[in-house]
Amino acid sequence: MIQVRNLKKTFIKDGNRIEVLRGLDLKIEDGTSLAILGVSGAGKTTFVHILGTLDHPTSGEVLFNGLDVFNWPEKKLASFRNRTIGFVFQFHNLLPEFSSLENTMMPALISGMPRRNALERAETLLHDVGLGDRMTHKPSELSGGEQQRVAVARALVMEPEILLADEPTGNLDTETGRKIEDILLELNRQKGITLIVVTHNQSLAGRMSRSIGLRDGEIVTCA
């Protein structure tokens, strides 16, 4: 379970104090699918970066199963992030010189997993997302939807408990975006992964078990 308590994030820009998140409180149960909605500048991406431990809060707490991981040394925090959290972004961020299979394996190899185990996991995941026949292809040889499916497989190779997706269908056409949505929601249902998605897509939000709306760094709706 993730517990967010009075979470605040402030940036200083050109000598001005900018409050991006203003005292958020939220509880996310294990296995939940949660949509985070809001206009650009509402604080959605900053919130997800903190949930993913990519950024630190200015004040407040984010507890993972009761643990305040932001008090940990950076090396321990990075290890927790790699083992526990998967990320899918609007831009796939695949390494252009590597194949689909190699890109998918990368987080596992970085973690020290034996290559054989990483290979087996990556092959299984690429089959699961419908790319069993595209494993040797590099990103430039894949469509936008295929690239994003590789990104989903890569996010899952460490078997994370939490999957964070920031506008995962934002660069895709409606049909392709729907396929990515189906994959993410099926993973949530079948594997019990906690799925947190930032989106402008009301249709996708309606398919999630919960949704919240952010405005000016505050939660204004919760369903």
Curated annotation (Swiss-Prot):
GO biological process, one term: protein localization to outer membrane
Keywords attached to this entry: ATP-binding, Cell inner membrane, Cell membrane, Membrane, Nucleotide-binding, Translocase, Transport
The protein's Enzyme Commission number: 7.6.2.-
Chief location category: membrane
Name the record gives this protein: Lipoprotein-releasing system ATP-binding protein LolD
InterPro entries named in the record: AAA+_ATPase (IPR003593), ABC_transporter-like_ATP-bd (IPR003439), ABC_transporter-like_CS (IPR017871), ABC_transpr_LolD-like (IPR015854), MacB-like_ATP-bd (IPR017911), P-loop_NTPase (IPR027417)
Membrane topology, as annotated: Peripheral membrane protein
Protein's UniProt keywords contain Translocase: yes
GO CC list: plasma membrane
Function per UniProt: Part of the ABC transporter complex LolCDE involved in the translocation of mature outer membrane-directed lipoproteins, from the inner membrane to the periplasmic chaperone, LolA. Responsible for the formation of the LolA-lipoprotein complex in an ATP-dependent manner.
Binding site for ATP: 38-45
Pfam family, one: ABC_tran
Subunit and interaction comment: The complex is composed of two ATP-binding proteins (LolD) and two transmembrane proteins (LolC and LolE).
Residues covered by the ABC transporter domain: 2-223
Compartments it resides in: Cell inner membrane
Record-stated family: Belongs to the ABC transporter superfamily. Lipoprotein translocase (TC 3.A.1.125) family.
